[in-house]
Amino acid sequence: MLREVTITRAIVESYYRDLLNNLELDVAIVGAGPSGMVAAYYLAKGGAKVAIFEKKLSIGGGIWGGGMGFNKVVVQDEAREILDEFGIRYEEFEKGYYVADAIEVATTIASKVVKSGVKIFNMIEVEDLVIKDNRVSGIVINWTPVLMAGLHVDPLTIEAKYVIDSTGHGAQVAQFLVKRGLLKEIPGEGAMWAEQGEKLTVKNTREVFPGLYVTGMAANAIAGAPRMGPIFGGMFLSGRKAAQEILKKLKS
């Protein structure tokens, strides 16, 4: 016989256990878009304890819609090896241009991330940062519906040695530092220029404040660099670069 209360208990107890197990992290990633998920995968693969916090109900960021709702994405030569590592199928459109199904990209990356040991907490929004001794030391979290409704409910905190801002165009985590005068004003992304946007996304992936890395479009927003549209190689390479740099620091 199925009992509703047993179903409820199973959900509450297992979620509670997951949350307790992720209160202290090596890396807390904010945003489950392409760069954030790829960073999580490589961090977990390197032995780091990592979790992702996504404010929306769904994960994947801008992958799902491809270009203008045509659910295909393009990846260039430099990032093709990442598609291969994740086992994502693609076809060559022209030399140096590879096309993949956006749904396969989003679901395959997400599956690999979860199976690598990363816990993704969706519907949880980061509303502030923990800052101690002039260093980002964690994130302040609350339920997305609570913040959407404007309810006065105090948040909880997650401790982390490093935080990654993978929130995309708004660079929402870095904005908390701007608000407190700890980071200069964020100019936002520039106009579309795919080639430069892709290169600069990787170049701008860095630690912008002690304990805080930026990846993907958040990295370009902070630098005022161009947007690039539905080509995702830069996002993937950005996530991998952040993971590699953080792993070196964790092991030093």
Swiss-Prot record:
Main enzyme class: transferase
Superkingdom to which the source organism belongs: Archaea
Pfam families reported for this sequence: Thi4
InterPro entries assigned: FAD/NAD-bd_sf (IPR036188), Thi4_fam (IPR002922), Thi4_prok (IPR022828)
UniProt KW Iron keyword: yes
Keyword Transferase: yes
Residues holding Fe cation: D154, H169
Residues engaged in binding glycine: R227
Record's keyword terms, sorted: Iron, Metal-binding, NAD, Thiamine biosynthesis, Transferase
Molecular function per GO: iron ion binding; pentosyltransferase activity
This enzyme's EC code(s): 2.4.2.59
Recorded metabolic or biological pathway in which this protein acts: Cofactor biosynthesis; thiamine diphosphate biosynthesis
Reported cofactor(s): Fe(2+)
Catalytic reactions on record: hydrogen sulfide + glycine + NAD(+) = ADP-5-ethyl-4-methylthiazole-2-carboxylate + nicotinamide + 3 H2O + H(+)
GO BP annotation list: thiamine biosynthetic process; thiamine diphosphate biosynthetic process; thiazole biosynthetic process
Binding site for NAD(+): S35, E54, K55, G62, V126, H152, V153, D154, M217
Role description: Involved in the biosynthesis of the thiazole moiety of thiamine. Catalyzes the conversion of NAD and glycine to adenosine diphosphate 5-(2-hydroxyethyl)-4-methylthiazole-2-carboxylate (ADT), an adenylated thiazole intermediate, using free sulfide as a source of sulfur.
NCBIfam families the UniProt entry points to: sulfide-dependent adenosine diphosphate thiazole synthase (TIGR00292)
Quaternary structure and interacting proteins, as annotated: Homooctamer; tetramer of dimers.
PANTHER family noted in UniProt: THIAMINE THIAZOLE SYNTHASE
Protein name as annotated: Thiamine thiazole synthase
